[in-house]
Amino acid sequence: MDLSEPIHDFLLVFLGSGLILGGLGVVLLPNPIYSAFSLGLVLVCTSLFYILSNSYFVAAAQLLIYVGAINVLIIFAVMFMNGSEYYKDFHLWTVGNGITSMVCISLFISLITTISDTSWYGIIWTTRSNQIIEQDFLSNSQQIGIHLSTDFFLPFELISIILLVALIGAIAVARQ
């Protein structure tokens, strides 16, 4: 997307905060339905990050596959479970939660200090001068389609067969 720098920065901060809040919602909310909806927020924000980086095909695949299929499947599976069992032994804070929180906070602080101490001056951005001219006239989705139908035809078909078998198995298990 060709946006001005302040708008781009604002969208990055907005989507980043959506990712953080959605991730916290996935982990901290006691109701699994609300956690699944928070996961949907995280996946939509990730898809919008792909749109900001001009990867429209990956963004569409993210929305269709993860939000449209996986997250709906998670919500569908959670709705089949008995909801009363989630609130029986719910303790607000345990020792394991404290240890996990301390480990995550220490990893976060070490990551922030590593990023801030790194010299970013020597990084050289690569150019597209050595690519073939004809590929510039094709969009990303056309290039992916060409590769899937030529170079990666056999792995693509094998993955589709494996997913079909898994779907049939899930339906058979759900019917019993």
UniProtKB/Swiss-Prot annotation:
Gene: ndhG
Origin organism lineage: Eukaryota, Viridiplantae, Streptophyta, Embryophyta, Tracheophyta
Organism for this UniProt entry: Solanum bulbocastanum
Enzyme class name: translocase
EC number: 7.1.1.-
Membrane topology: Multi-pass membrane protein
GO CC terms in record: chloroplast thylakoid membrane
Family under the similarity heading: Belongs to the complex I subunit 6 family.
Protein name: NAD(P)H-quinone oxidoreductase subunit 6, chloroplastic
Membrane among keywords: yes
Key words of the record: Chloroplast, Membrane, NAD, NADP, Plastid, Plastoquinone, Quinone, Thylakoid, Translocase, Transmembrane, Transmembrane helix, Transport
